Amino acid sequence: MDEAIAIDAEPLIAYYWDEPGADAVEGVIDAVERGHVQGWINTVTCTEVRYVCGRDDPETARQYVSRIRNWFDVVTAETVWERAAACKQAHRIALGDVFTIATAMEKDAVAYCGADDDFNGIDVDVRRFRDDGV
């Protein structure tokens, strides 16, 4: 297992909805909770998880994101915005994903993400919890 990860929204959303790959995400969350892996999350990622999961039940999603923020150390957008902007300028990538990438770079961590190809060709170590989208 990696020493440090910066988690993207896709794994957390998959875990919330028990999608394919949720078991792998659970293992990572467990490793972070037990202190075996240093976990980082950006505030932009928290925002994405909250609004996507909140489409079904806003209060449950709020509680879930609150727990996530207890599991992972939070990096603010302010901390990495310039690095995120440079990444967005150089690559065709979703705005939320650049904040995961910038957080991984800032914290010398592996970007933990899903199957989307936004992370391809970026100068950051990537680990995927699944190879196919849902």
What is the predicted role of each segment?
Residues M1-W40, G54-Q63:
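Short, well-structured N-terminal submotif of metal-dependent ribonuclease cores
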Residues T43-V44, D97, A115-D117:
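Short secondary-structure boundary segments
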Residues A4, V74, I101, E106-V134:
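Acidic, PIN/NYN-like endoribonuclease modules and their adjacent C-terminal/linker elements
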